Amino acid sequence: MNKLHIKKGDTVYVNAGDYKGKIGCVLKVFLGKQRALVEGVNIISKTIKPSAKNPQGGFEKKEASIHISNLNVLDPKTGKPVRIGRKLGERGMLIRFSKKSGDEIK
């Protein structure tokens, strides 16, 4: 399995689909499915059955996952969507960087 270019906490741009053009923060990444939960993107209504805690029941709005191929990380310098590269840092660990500006992405 390849490593993903998206991490939890990244600010991402949706580049395809119904939510194209939206910007949000990654809440969770599902490695096996190659999907991510992005704040404010792909909102669905989920039906809640009546229970002791919630006798009325009703609907709950929440984010559904979106495939990572539809996401680009935003460049910290320019604020525009960019492709991500990886290189070895000084301590021998991989660091992510913007292919356009060359800046490190934390």
UniProtKB/Swiss-Prot annotation:
InterPro entries: KOW, Rib_uL2_dom2, Ribosomal_uL24, Ribosomal_uL24_KOW, Translation_prot_SH3-like_sf
SMART domains according to UniProt: KOW
Pfam families for the chain: KOW, ribosomal_L24
Residue pairs linked by disulfide bridges in the UniProt entry: none
One MF term in the entry's GO annotations: structural constituent of ribosome
Superkingdom classification of source: Bacteria
GO aspect biological process, one term: translation
GO cellular component entries: ribonucleoprotein complex; ribosome
SUPFAM superfamilies recorded: Translation proteins SH3-like domain
Keywords associated with the record: Ribonucleoprotein, Ribosomal protein, RNA-binding, rRNA-binding
NCBIfam families the record matches: rplX_bact
Record-stated family: Belongs to the universal ribosomal protein uL24 family.
Subunit composition and interactions: Part of the 50S ribosomal subunit.
Job of this protein: One of two assembly initiator proteins, it binds directly to the 5'-end of the 23S rRNA, where it nucleates assembly of the 50S subunit.
Protein name per Swiss-Prot or TrEMBL: Large ribosomal subunit protein uL24
Organism this protein belongs to: Azobacteroides pseudotrichonymphae genomovar. CFP2
The gene coding this protein: rplX
